[in-house]
Amino acid sequence: MIKLIAFDLDGTLTQHKTMLETENRNVLTALSERYHLVMVGAGACMRIFRQMGGFPIDVIGNYGMQKGIYNDRTKSLDIEEASVPCDKESVDARVTALREKYGFTEFSGDNVQFHASGCITFPILGTTANAADKLEFDPDRSRRRAIYDDVCEVFSDYNVFVGGSSSFDMAPRPYDKRYALEKYAAENGYTLDEIAYVGDDYGRGGNDEAVYKSNIRFIKVDDYRKFPEIINAEGFLN
């Protein structure tokens, strides 16, 4: 019996980087009366929380390197953070080698984006690239998936994801959404067969892929506008 339902945000509950709409919020409210709900995201907890309009829910961020527990008194999140030291010289050298190998030597801004948590982003077009250029670079992810295995091998100490529109996101091992969700479930007394995960990015290199390939029940949402229909079809509100 499912007791804990976890959700991705962008593409699953919302359009990318847009606010949670009323219809999907109402479905979450109905689900919260029957199940324990949690968000599992690639971004920071407070960004996810704000995008959801302060919906009362725990939020796991940065692939499990951040956890926000909803505080009913403050109507906000109490944040716990983990961080892993990053060898910036090594990372920079490895990214540079990949650029030279695949011809990505022209870029705007920084070669690598380093995050306080220890996560890193390899922005193929650079950290200050034009938004339109980023959107046009690899809309179907085929260019990045073509070199994905090589990037994974070069960064074997990280879990690598085909992120955004023109980058690779990397989290220090063992952090990924599966690790984060299983850890949260164990801390809250849930077994794997009591969990369902709802996500859209389950393809090769996607940040939901690790959960999709696990034994956790996975609910595919390929269009966030169909989220209510999919939830009803799965029988969660019957």
Name each region found by the language model.
Residues 1-2, 34, 56, 117, ...:
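A general structural motif
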Residues 101, 106-196, 204-207:
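Conserved acidic, metal-coordinating active-site core of Asp-based
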Residues 6-7:
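Walker B beta-strand of ABC/ABC-like P-loop ATPase nucleotide-binding domains
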Residues 60-63, 164, 222:
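Residues at the C-termini of beta-strands that transition into short coil/loop
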Residues 1, 20, 171-173, 177-238:
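Mg2+-dependent phosphoryl-transfer enzymes with acidic/Ser/Thr/Gly-rich catalytic loops
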